[in-house]
Amino acid sequence: MDQHHGVRGGAPIRRPRRSIETRSHPFRAAGNTQRTYSTPRLSYRDGLSGRASSLEPGGQAHDQNESSTQSTSNNQPSTSFWGYLRRVFSDDAPAQPQAPRSRADFAPPPEEDSSSEEEDEEGPSQAPLDEEDQLMYADQYSVGNSSDDNEEDYLQPEVEYPTSAESGEYHNSGMFAEEEPESESESDMENYETYEENDTEVISDDSHRLTRTWLDRSIRLMDDALAQSSEISKAITKSTRRLYDSQFTPGGRGYKQTETPSQRLVHLSRAGMYDSDEIVMTGDYMEVDDDPNSAYQSWVRAIHHPVAMNPSWEETISNHTNTSFSADIDYDIDELIEMNLARTPPVFEGLLDSADFFYRLPMLYTYATITQDEAYEERQAWSNTQALHGHEQSSWPALVSDYSKGGMYVSPTQEPRGIWRRALKQAMALQLKLCVLGLTEFVTKRELTQHHSAVTFLVDSLLRTAKNCYLASRLLVFAWERRRETGVRRPAEPLIALSGVTLLQPLPPEVSELLEQRTFDIGLRTPQSGVFRAFFGPLVYWAELRRALRDPAAINCRYVGFHLQTSEIYLLARAHSASPGYTKEELVAMEATLTLGTLMLEVALQWIHVASAQLLSENDALKAFRRVSASIPHALAPLGSIRLHDAEFEVLSNPDVMVARDETALSQALFLGYFSVRTALTACMRDYANEVDGGSKETVTGLFLGVGLIIQRLAGHMNFLLNCMAGAALYGGSKIAIHSLTLPRYSLLADVMAPMLQQQSLVDFWRARDDMLEELEITPRPGPPTQGKRVVLEMPLPSDDLPAMTPSGQVNNGAGLGRMVDMAKHLQHYRETIIGDDASSSVGKRGLMKSGVGVRHALEAEKVIRYSPKST
């Protein structure tokens, strides 16, 4: 009978039908049309482990390979009718009974490394200033030609929606945007695959990646191995994933990038400012400024103590043997021309010739060859920096090792300022995987022995960011002017909320002609630029690039990169998907760091805005540039900003923040990271002011690029920190109070910095963490570690760097941070920009209800998402 009817007794043999998209992209989550480096890989817990990747509504596992698997094996009896007949008429011996599996929640992770050997080791009254309460040119400008005649007509929404300053509807307008073209049709995909299979040419971009043909074959082998329950399916799946990632991660042939600004950004740039709008400024800003410090004598009377610098930074500077710029850099201009490096960056192609550009920004020295000895010395300087946890940190690893595989336990320890050593070393490997290895693998595969492409990207993206600052500052001015308008003439609500407190201030048109634009610039869209802006700002880890900027920029970039890496290691060592929450003290410190870090990023971007205009100007000694030319502000206030000075006093003098700073290891790491950035940026800006008047133009250019490298890493760190906090609020149900203007400010700055950094959404971030943990063979586990893995690293005393960093008092009243609001509720207005536009509508309701906000607010948040207006 078997011979006549086949092994299934006549039952039809048919595989479940899958779409062309699913067959071509098995590691892409359903519904995702764009595969980024952080999107999930085919339900990593199920499909990639060989189990069924979906469940029936009743809770039974759906065996999608029943027809093929059971037909080839007699050891797994079928429960179908044909299977019953087959067992009745078959002479085969019945299958041996199998012992029931232990429950997953009580079973230890498979192949968990024992760390019993770890037990043997030891855990090591003032006059108020109005300098920044108003715009830089207060009382010296007026809004001209701002009539609303000739405005474009917008569709009036037919539904009611909130219009409060918190709503931030423009962040959700993507739901009403024009639908993206659907994925390729089946015939188109077949034609594409046929073409690829016949394509045997070498990849022209010298990426040395395997062609798509190998990926197609590997996917088919993986499908066959999973269908037959082959024992080598896990190895085939892992190799297929590696091939897939090489194609569809940033830099891969299949990685697609958006070529034009999103419709949300288009709406944002048009809401509140029109083609006929312009800013007319009056005053003496076009006069030569012989003494920029003369405008800041009132600061000397108001602030009695200079800005405090990190003691560890001062020690680093004092121990450094070469803190000055080396004028005898050896490079051949003819060789650079032959290598096509001495050319104008793409942002100014057609506007400035190469000779004119490099006269204004003399940066050709950054293309000089960095020897292997110099690069090794720079990497060793990073590794030799003393970390809070006492272990060595790497900036350019060849591979990730020296961690325990198996369970990862992130629960709080009994000791104050303590952390599990097992989790810490696992977090060090995970941080390298998330933030560093993507760049190192790209550089290795492309055989980029030099840093030239990174320098070109850095200067190009930095100038594009300055152009976005030009646009954003004007949008905010007109948002303030039209804040009382209604209907389609009303600007976006986040712009209105920020317009009265922003530090992005407009420059006179006469000194910023090269920065003028009317739409947001999203930057270059090449494979290399995709890598350089991904992975939370990875360029600071590249030793050759840091060394190319020369001191004093190089040493400050290294100092910032190291301490922000430490902060992220502690963040990863304290939470994962099985335990996404933090302690109350840790959340207080995280909120304070996020609020101050976002404000500091805004101050730094305004500095980039003014410095870019100054470097590109034919006369860099004008009064319009006094904010970057004067040295007094940077000697008295952090980053030369009274607003940041007052915000630090307001936040850091809070008793809850002071307790959190001293009582938890994570809080100390976060604040040390913040003050490291604040110290390094202040030092670079101060050195820039000292050099710009008659000093070395090469040093000025190096400091400008160094500030850009630091703020890329700072913005990536803020993205990292925000996703950890948002996960604790929405996934962990923690009730977190956050300043109401932090998220609007963060979202606007993320749009401004789009040429430099690719923002990662909450959903993508947590999926990427789980994916990377699986690749590292680490399993998130709730609770404390088991016996033999309970070694604690504890800092005996609070860090000496932190107590003296808080300013002694405020200069003005109020720092423009907003009132305290619930984070879980506030996040619902930022579905596209923060949570992720591919998130389900239920994301966050669990956090709202667990944090005590209630069902009513959860339903209101869902209503706001559903009825976001198209016009904003």
Swiss-Prot record:
Its main location: virion. Residues 1-206 are annotated as: Disordered. InterPro entries: Herpes_UL47. Keywords: Glycoprotein, Host cytoplasm, Host nucleus, Late protein, Transcription, Transcription regulation, Virion, Virion tegument. Residues 66-80, 91-101 have a biased composition (Low complexity). A motif (Nuclear localization signal) lies at residues 13-33. One of its GO terms (cellular component) is host cell nucleus. It is found in: Virion tegument; Host nucleus; Host cytoplasm. The keyword Transcription applies. Residues 110-134, 177-204 have a biased composition (Acidic residues). Pfam families: Herpes_UL47. Belongs to the alphaherpesvirinae HHV-1 UL47 family. The nuclear export signal is CRM1-dependent. Tegument protein that can bind to various RNA transcripts. Plays a role in the attenuation of selective viral and cellular mRNA degradation by modulating the activity of host shutoff RNase UL41/VHS. Also plays a role in the primary envelopment of virions in the perinuclear space, probably by interacting with two nuclear egress proteins UL31 and UL34. Expressed in late in the infection. Interacts with US3 kinase. Interacts with UL31 and UL34; these interactions seem important for efficient virion nuclear egress. Interacts with UL41/VHS. This is Tegument protein UL47 homolog. The gene is 13.
